[in-house]
Amino acid sequence: MNIDIEFLKYPIGKFQKPATITYDLIQEAIAVIKSFPAHIFTAVSPLSVVQLDTPYRPGGWTVRQLVHHCADSHMNAFTRFKLALTEENPTIKPYDEAAWARLADADLPIESSLAIITAMHLKWGVVLDSMKEEDFKKTYFHPEKKHSQELAEIVLLYAWHSRHHLSHVQHLILREKW
């Protein structure tokens, strides 16, 4: 069987920052972020332990690690949003997501991270809905990227990130006929 690893890595493609980020695009991204907990829960809750411990692609994370990664990543994103909203271009703290995915909590049942995702996305959604259009121009400095990023870009990035990992699970389920 011929496996397209690039497709398995990026089933919806890599994130592409639009040349112009409109307020409509921001609102669409907010809707994706707010709906992510329900979508990921629907995708993973019927899976068995064996299925949860199946990598979504050769050499990739298991579904369990992916769910825990989404909780970790989105908690960091939410914290970065709050920093950018309350400080002037704060420098954020990068982290090694692959190393985090190997820590002991990555072996926990997924319910812990699903609960975090649900609660945190509720809070994030409230903050996003409260933001004025000009708030999305606020920035934080990413030391690894060596430049500041606007919250408008970041909200689109995390909408993509949500759909990206949800697609990993959905494509695995389809490929394996689960």
Predicted regions and their residues:
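A broad, low-specificity signal for short, low-complexity segments enriched in glycine/proline
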Residues: N2, I26-I30, T86, V127
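Acidic/histidine-rich alpha-helical segments that form the ligand environment
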Residues: A31-A43, W100-K138
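Short, contiguous alpha-helical
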Residues: M1-I12, Q16, L52-A98, T139-W178
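A short, mixed-charge helix-start or loop-turn motif at secondary-structure junctions
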Residues: T22-I26, L103-I110, H147-L151
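Generic serine detector
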Residues: S35, S45-S48, S73, S112-S113, ...
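Amphipathic, soluble alpha-helical interaction motifs
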Residues: H39, A43-P46, V50, R80, ...
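Short, contiguous, helix-prone interaction/anchoring segments in small proteins
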Residues: I21-R57
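A generic "alpha-helical surface" signal
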Residues: Q27-K34, R64, H68, E111, ...
